[in-house]
């Protein structure tokens, strides 16, 4: 690559690095093209991407961003995984892929602007997705309203049952 191309790539990468929600550095030594393509496609479905970038370009692109905190880990052949949406989905994909493929070694990550370890990334992967958490919250909120309606309607319902029993008893006596 000539200097202009490198500068352009660094600027584009800098823009992407400024907007990530999840960033993961991984060693991919020995991984074949087919596996790398599969991983890229899976990540793309979850609003994330995998970039193989030279360490010097990554150092330049990460200046004045939160990713600058990981500069000590920019060593060896690196894959940079950037997630732009819900961080749980890409972390699940990476954790599952790393378990099945020993060639992918997750090194360190960053959640927004906090450095996370591989263990914390695995814990993040165990969380339910955002949609599932929202559904659980909604069911709790609806459950409270349903219980409130049941409690409030219990007194009138009881009164109606007492009056109906009184009416039935009166009809029997007549």
From Swiss-Prot:
Claim: Methyltransferase is one of the keywords in the record: no
Pfam families in the record: Ribosomal_L10
Organism this protein belongs to: Syntrophus aciditrophicus (strain SB)
The protein, known as: Large ribosomal subunit protein uL10
GO cellular component, one term: ribonucleoprotein complex
SS bonds (residue pairs): none
Family, similarity comment: Belongs to the universal ribosomal protein uL10 family.
Transmembrane feature ranges: none
Subunit structure: Part of the ribosomal stalk of the 50S ribosomal subunit. The N-terminus interacts with L11 and the large rRNA to form the base of the stalk. The C-terminus forms an elongated spine to which L12 dimers bind in a sequential fashion forming a multimeric L10(L12)X complex.
Keywords carried by this UniProt record: Ribonucleoprotein, Ribosomal protein, RNA-binding, rRNA-binding
Annotated gene: rplJ
UniProt keyword annotation of Ribonucleoprotein present: yes
NCBIfam families in the cross-refs: PRK00099.1-1
Molecular-function annotations in GO: large ribosomal subunit rRNA binding
GO biological process, one term: translation
Xref: SUPFAM superfamilies: Ribosomal protein L10-like
InterPro entries linked: Ribosomal_uL10 (IPR001790), Ribosomal_uL10-like_sf (IPR043141), Ribosomal_uL10_bac (IPR022973), Ribosomal_uL10_bac_type (IPR047865)
